[in-house]
């Protein structure tokens, strides 16, 4: 029977659609009594089953179906040094970052405006994968994926304890604490 003929039958009020439904057998009180008797007899079996932890018996499952991400589980790290001559080579840098490789990008061979465009492009890709970026030198940059931690040891070497006396005098003048703002005192007294 097609959909259109069924719709016509419903609109016309024909009762032959009632034959399309199956008759359901409802449980009687006898069925419930048999169920309750079986429940009382099997209550000790149910108690032992409910006390057992279903998560203890994992021997039937394979040890692990998880596949690690490339570059994270291996101890081999790769650093790529790239010296592009044009912006057209920048997608290779992004691909290396996606493969979890650290990239040192030497842009001294490019024109300054193209180099700026390249750095912006790769910095955006690095940001998209939660990576890190550092400027190493003039037109030389380090881009690393999120699985690599980048630390800057230059800041440790340039600390005030490692500098000469001239540097210490300069730094002590520059790092003197700033005076409190005038509005800070009135707010503090008001509280």
Swiss-Prot record:
Keywords: Cell cycle, Cell division, Cytoplasm, Septation
Keyword Cell division: yes
Any single GO CC term annotated in Swiss-Prot or TrEMBL for this entry: cytoplasm
Region: Disordered, residue numbers: 156-191
Compartments, as annotated in UniProt: Cytoplasm
UniProt feature, compositional bias: Polar residues: 156-167
Residue ranges of the TM segments: none
Predominant place of localization: cytoplasm
GO biological process assignments: division septum assembly; FtsZ-dependent cytokinesis
Keyword DNA damage among UniProt keywords: no
Its biological purpose: Cell division protein that is part of the divisome complex and is recruited early to the Z-ring. Probably stimulates Z-ring formation, perhaps through the cross-linking of FtsZ protofilaments. Its function overlaps with FtsA.
Family: Belongs to the SepF family.
Binding partners and assembly: Homodimer. Interacts with FtsZ.
Protein name: Cell division protein SepF
Organism name: Prochlorococcus marinus (strain NATL2A)
């Amino acid at each position: 029977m097609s959909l259109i003929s069924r719709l016509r039958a419903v609109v016309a009020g024909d009762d032959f659609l009632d034959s399309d439904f199956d008759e359901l057998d409802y449980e009687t009180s006898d069925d419930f009594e048999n169920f309750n008797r079986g429940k009382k007899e099997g209550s000790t079996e149910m108690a032992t089953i409910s006390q057992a932890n279903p998560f203890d018996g994992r021997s039937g499952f394979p040890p692990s179906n998880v596949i690690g991400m490339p570059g994270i589980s291996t101890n081999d790290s790769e650093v790529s040094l790239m010296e592009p001559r044009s912006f057209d080579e920048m997608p290779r840098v992004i691909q290396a970052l996606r493969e979890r490789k650290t990239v040192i990008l030497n842009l001294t061979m490019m024109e300054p405006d193209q180099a700026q465009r390249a750095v912006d492009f790769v910095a955006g890709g690095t940001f998209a994968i939660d990576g890190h970026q550092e400027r190493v030198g003039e037109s030389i940059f380090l881009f690393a994926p999120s699985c690599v931690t980048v630390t800057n040891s230059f800041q440790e070497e340039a600390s005030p304890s490692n500098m000469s006396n001239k540097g210490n005098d300069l730094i002590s003048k520059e790092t003197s604490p700033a005076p409190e703002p005038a509005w800070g005192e009135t707010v503090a007294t008001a509280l």
